[in-house]
A protein has these predicted regions:
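N-terminal leader/targeting and pre-domain segments
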Residues: 1-29, 104-113
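Short pre-active-site segment immediately N-terminal to redox-active cysteine/selenocysteine motifs
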Residues: 26-27, 34-37, 77
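The canonical Cys-X-X-Cys-His
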Residues: 38-41, 81
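Typically the conserved alpha-helix immediately C-terminal to a functionally engaged Cys/Sec
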Residues: 40-53
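Conserved acidic residues
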Residues: 62-64
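A short glycine-leucine-enriched loop at secondary-structure breakpoints
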Residues: 71-76
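Non-catalytic, surface beta->alpha helical segment in thiol-disulfide oxidoreductase systems
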Residues: 77, 82-113
């Protein structure tokens, strides 16, 4: 998973800031909020998440490296997942169950072409 390092990157995803010239933003992104010390986060199968639903752009936000974005998004616990679809935040889920997260993402994902 690519790291979501700054609030600027998040604001580009939700259309509050313009991306760099030539950068095409993904239509459907899931942001995974985590921390190195989070034992519940380690129980997730990140490979299964990334491969489980086609067409999903996955980003990881370490709350100790980027503490502004989780607060801005209302993240209260980790692991938490946030869906951004067509520049809108459309869902949030706090869970350390890989299958539950996959089912939630699959239900929200647009059909793949």
């Amino acid at each position: 998973m690519k790291l979501l390092i700054s609030q600027v990157e998040f604001e580009q995803l939700i259309g509050r800031q313009e991306p760099e010239p030539g950068v095409v933003l993904p239509q459907f992104t899931v942001i995974y909020f985590t921390a190195a010390w989070c034992s519940a986060c380690r129980s997730l199968d990140l490979d299964a998440l990334e491969k489980g639903v086609p067409g999903v752009n996955w980003l990881k936000c370490d709350i100790d490296q980027n503490d502004y974005t989780p607060g801005y998004c209302g993240v209260r616990s980790i692991p938490t997942f946030l869906i951004v679809h067509d520049k809108k935040v459309v869902g949030m889920l706090s869970s350390n169950k890989t299958q539950k997260v996959l089912e939630w993402v699959a239900a929200a994902a647009p059909p793949t072409k």
